């Protein structure tokens, strides 16, 4: 039974995190990830991602798709409009972000990955393999600038390997495994972690966010406000 006190954190910015029904994307992506029991890529939630451009490739209207059930919270894939055409990308297998029920000391391991054929545009073939190892390593109360919450803490160790095949050169290579650790404080009735800390190798903090009150005008679609903060000292110890 822990007491985590992060009440003195100071936010540097605020973003809006909105969860939509999967059918609300208004494109062929919603058909690919339709909420149907016969669909292996079934989803019932989605969230907007960031648009970007890479050379001749323009990526817009990015969506992350999720399936929330009594057994798990998983990501079956994501999709975007690439050069004007919808491109769904299924994770095979899907990424199990949480496996329910979550109780103290419970664990689960999820293997996921996807492939992306960009040989006609960028001349590369890209694939990702991800291993997510979850451990519920604490329970108690956590205090942030927004309030005090009963919470479970989930530690997720994520190891990702990216592979590239360069079509014009006729060879491929894989990057060294990249390990990140996510600490998430989950509280009943909250749709997002009330606090999340992401770290890289050596415990270097790469991102922190906590559930916050709105500092801008609210609308009906807004699910929650997320404040991002800078934490010191950096790196942190295992007492995080």
Pin down the residues of each PLM region.
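Single, functionally critical "micro-switch" positions that shape active/binding sites
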Residues: 145, 232-233
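Short coil/turn motif common to extracellular beta-sandwich-like domains
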Residues: 235-240
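Extracellular-facing segments of soluble proteins and assemblies that are Gly/Ser/Thr-biased and enriched
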Residues: 48-131, 135-136
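Short, solvent-exposed secondary-structure boundary motifs
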Residues: 42-59, 123-126, 172-177, 218-224
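Solvent-exposed N-terminal domain segments of exported/luminal and surface proteins
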Residues: 1-70
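Acidic, serine/threonine-rich low-complexity disordered tracts
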Residues: 1-14, 110-218
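Residue-level detector of functionally pivotal "anchor" positions at catalytic/ligand-binding pockets or at interdomain
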Residues: 211-232
């Amino acid at each position: 039974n822990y007491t985590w006190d992060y009440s003195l954190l100071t936010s540097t910015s605020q973003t809006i995190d909105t969860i939509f029904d999967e059918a609300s994307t208004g494109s062929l992506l919603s058909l690919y990830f339709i909420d149907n029991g016969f669909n292996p890529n079934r989803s019932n939630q989605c969230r907007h991602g960031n648009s970007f451009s890479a050379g001749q490739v323009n990526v817009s209207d990015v969506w992350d798709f999720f399936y929330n059930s009594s057994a798990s919270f998983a990501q079956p894939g994501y999709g975007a409009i690439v050069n004007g055409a919808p491109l769904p990308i299924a994770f095979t297998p899907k990424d199990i972000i949480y496996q329910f029920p979550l109780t103290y000391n419970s664990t689960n391991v999820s293997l996921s990955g996807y492939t992306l054929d960009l040989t006609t545009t960028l001349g590369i073939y890209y694939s990702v393999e991800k291993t997510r190892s979850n451990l519920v390593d604490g329970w108690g109360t956590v205090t942030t600038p927004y309030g005090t919450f009963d919470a479970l803490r989930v530690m997720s160790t994520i190891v990702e390997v990216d592979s590239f095949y360069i079509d014009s050169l006729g060879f491929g290579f894989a990057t060294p495994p990249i390990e990140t650790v996510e600490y998430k404080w989950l509280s009943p009735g909250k749709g997002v972690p009330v606090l999340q800390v992401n770290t890289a190798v050596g415990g270097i903090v790469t991102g922190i966010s906590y559930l916050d009150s709105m500092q801008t005008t609210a609308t009906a679609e807004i699910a929650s406000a997320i404040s991002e903060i800078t934490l010191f000292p950096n790196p942190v110890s295992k007492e995080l």
